[in-house]
Amino acid sequence: MSDTTFMKMNADRYIRMALEEDITSEDISTNCVMPEYQKGQVDLICKQDGVICGLWVFQRVFELLDDTVTFDMKVKEGDFVHAGDLMAVVTGDIRTLLSGERTALNYLQRMSGIATYTHEIAQLLEGSHTTLLDTRKTTPNMRLFEKYAVKVGGGSNHRYNLSDGVMLKDNHIGAAGSITKAVRMAKEYASFVHKIEVEVETLEQVKEACEAGADIIMLDNMTPDKMKDRKSVV
């Protein structure tokens, strides 16, 4: 199963929560002035240059409200679009289109923004041996979508959640007593398929983590020059 398939399978519960948060019992403004069963059309037009991301989420928002809504997509996921480009034509019940508009755009705009920024950084790293990774510092209930956007923009995902891998930070190391003890405990507890990553701040910690058998060394908040020095030890 691909990452995209997994994400799409798990997206509905979050999208439903977002719709419930915004609409609750009804869109009272729209229902005041729009008659029932009136068809309408919406043109989705790009406001600024960037990588488009989240088209399938945009579409799914409306589908969960009304499965008769139709979509004529003019661009593909991950395309670089320009201000003024027509990206999609959406046709359906006008009440549905107006009620779902904000939620659909919230997803599309946020995901496209992340994909665009990731794309800009990925271009700067082109030709190097550097992989651009994300973190777990995501917006609550948006992790699935934000991490997907990083991949669309040209980055890679680090841990998706706390069960994905062992990452020993300063708090874990402090509780264990040392990096060596923390790594040993992790090796005893975790499955052999889990890599053990250790966050370090000093040259001495880099050496200790390597000697302890850590699979990955994370250099925490270091300048490029300091990272070069630490890399030579590894």
What are the language-model segments listed below?
Residues 233-234:
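Conserved small/polar residues in nucleotide/adenosyl-binding loops
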Residues 222:
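Positively charged, low-complexity, intrinsically disordered RNA-binding extensions
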Residues 2-212, 216, 228:
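Acidic/glycine-rich phosphate/pyrophosphate-binding loops and surrounding catalytic core
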Residues 225:
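Glycine-centered loop/turn positions within well-structured domains
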